[in-house]
Amino acid sequence: MSAFRFLGLMVLLLLFSACGENSAVETPTDTVNTSKDEETQEVVKEESKTPIEEKIELKNFFMRDGAVASYLGEGNEYASYQARTQWHNDDTVSIYEDNGGTTVIRTYRITEGSIDLIKEQGEFYEQFNPTNDDLKSLPTLSTFLKLPLEKGTTFDEWTLVNVDQMLETPFETFDGVIVLEKTDDSGAIQRKYLVEGFGEVKREFLMKENDAEFIVTSTLETVE
């Protein structure tokens, strides 16, 4: 074999060797890309398993039909009262509030996005038994609660100032309390504390006069 032919064979062997090395390098790259694709698919699968936030049922901000709740009052002789719940249908409920001096009825219509007051009457000592058509004909007087239940939500001069407050009451200590606040033209502050499953568990009225602070509260004490 001549020297030139031998050199030619050596060059071919080196070229084949180089090609083999390049192929060996490219194979892991494809494997890495495949692994990344699989990881991405796994992440997507995990995200798809994340539970969707449960829809808020505004009707849960009232007590059961026939429930009688007693509220302990401080700061005023009429701050203590009893509240009886009467459900008319799936989306309409009345609360009879008796403070020892008078009984006030408030009737609410519940929609997907709000709880609206549709009847309010003092000196009411009867049982309110309207037909569904009667209830549908009642106009909205004001809004009691409105979605979204997020800090900063406003409606009818009320502002949602807290959605996760802890509150101690004579009945029990509540977590996740929703706090609504309103300030009137005189500077007096009103607050309502709402809990899912119970509704209003506390109301508060604060007013400053000269250097004195006047506070009236009604706080849930018992439920029968």
Where would I find each of the regions flagged by the language model?
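Conserved functional acidic sites
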Residues: 20-224
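C-terminal motif of bacterial Sec signal peptides marking the signal peptidase cleavage site
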Residues: 14-18
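Short hydrophobic/aromatic segments of transmembrane alpha-helices and their interfaces
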Residues: 7-8, 183
